[in-house]
Curated annotation (Swiss-Prot):
One of its GO terms (molecular function) is amino acid binding. One of its GO terms (biological process) is 'de novo' pyrimidine nucleobase biosynthetic process. PROSITE patterns: CARBAMOYLTRANSFERASE (PS00097). This is Aspartate carbamoyltransferase catalytic subunit. It is an enzyme of class 2 (transferase). Its EC number is 2.1.3.2. PANTHER family: ASPARTATE CARBAMOYLTRANSFERASE (PTHR45753:SF6), ORNITHINE CARBAMOYLTRANSFERASE, MITOCHONDRIAL (PTHR45753). It comes from the Bacteria. It comes from Salmonella arizonae (strain ATCC BAA-731 / CDC346-86 / RSK2980). The lineage of its organism: Bacteria, Pseudomonadati, Pseudomonadota, Gammaproteobacteria, Enterobacterales. One of its GO terms (cellular component) is cytosol. InterPro entries: Asp/Orn_carbamoyltranf_P-bd (IPR006132), Asp/Orn_carbamoylTrfase (IPR006130), Asp/Orn_carbamoylTrfase_sf (IPR036901), Asp_carbamoyltransf (IPR002082), Asp_carbamoyltransf_Asp/Orn-bd (IPR006131). The keyword Transferase applies. Heterododecamer (2C3:3R2) of six catalytic PyrB chains organized as two trimers (C3), and six regulatory PyrI chains organized as three dimers (R2). L-aspartate binds at residues 85, 168, 230.
């Protein structure tokens, strides 16, 4: 069967339809159950991280290696021609695309990944995060984890907590879950870090229910997924960061009254917003969530690099 994601750029979660999402998640489940160590044996993939990353970069590169691909790239742009000699992003991507079969890219500038697609030719670009804009592969592993733990992606109650203004993970995840029916959203954030209006407008256009709340306790008994985020110090001025970082903290005692199968997720890194006593509860699922990044990213790489895929 023809693969609709072959050589497709994945810049925003909106580049993927509901059917595309289901295809990626089904492929991830198959790869988790049945590893394919030679699936990308003759492929070369560029891992281009213009911004610091631990989990995303290592997860992507592990995914590449476990599928048998060769990996080239950099984890810091400071020592590249772009960083040292002032080469443009356009020229950097134009050159790299002559070497490889796919480009995985993180960049601090919003829109940089979309710009890269204009210079990569037929080489697909996978966005590993562009500023506070989009982080589609994090969303894929989030969806995979939600589906794995809840058995579905529709008719869910999802609370998102913390930095909802700059947190690209919650923007992408909300857009993705809005492709499925019957989902209800609870947004819990300080006013300075509230969910952007364009996300709320999108939910209204799709007829999705949402509400704003001032504390986690208000919604604890109602939710299936509690998605925590950190306040991103690197995206705030020091005075603003100090004011808001401690406003929303989850402790084990806060989980009293939670639904039995409610799971706490977090894109990581965790700072102070989830205390370590939560880790020992059956609700904590953020480390398993991070582990699922391998399978979600393997699935996406396998699909964009194979015109037909049979697992």
């Amino acid at each position: 069967m023809a693969n609709p994601l072959y050589q497709k750029h994945i810049i925003s979660i909106n580049d993927l339809s509901r059917d595309d999402l289901n295809l990626v998640l089904a492929t991830a489940a198959k790869l988790k159950a049945h590893p394919q160590p030679e699936l990308l044996k003759h492929k070369v993939i560029a891992s281009c991280f213009f911004e610091a990353s631990t989990r995303t970069r290592l997860s992507f590169e592990t995914s590449m290696h476990r599928l048998g691909a060769s990996v080239v790239g950099f984890s810091d742009s400071a020592n590249t021609s772009l960083g040292k000699k002032g080469e443009t992003l356009a020229d950097t991507i134009s050159v790299i695309s002559t070497y490889v079969d796919a480009i995985v890219m993180r960049h601090p500038q919003e829109g940089a990944a979309r710009l890269a697609t204009e210079f990569s030719g037929k080489v697909p670009v996978l966005n590993a995060g562009d500023g506070s804009n989009q982080h589609p592969t994090q969303t894929l592993l989030d969806l995979f984890t939600i589906q794995e733990t809840q058995g579905r992606l529709d008719n869910l109650h999802i609370a998102m907590v913390g930095d909802l203004k700059y947190g690209r993970t919650v923007h992408s995840l909300t857009q993705a879950l809005a492709k499925f029916s019957g989902n209800r959203f609870y947004f819990i954030a300080p006013e300075a870090l509230a969910m952007p209006q364009y996300i709320l407008d999108m939910l209204d256009e799709k007829g999705m229910d949402w509400s704003l709340h001032g504390s986690i306790e208000e919604v604890m008994a109602e939710v299936d997924i509690l998605y925590m985020t950190r306040v991103q110090k690197e995206r705030l001025d020091p005075s603003e960061y100090a004011n808001v970082k401690a406003q929303f903290v989850l402790r084990a005692s806060d989980l009293n009254g939670a639904r039995e199968n409610m799971k706490v997720l977090h894109p990581l890194p965790r700072i102070d917003e989830i205390t370590t006593d939560v880790d020992k509860t059956p609700h904590a699922w953020y480390f398993q969530q991070a582990g699922n990044g391998i399978f979600a990213r393997q699935a996406l790489l396998a699909l964009v690099l194979n015109s037909e895929l049979s697992l």
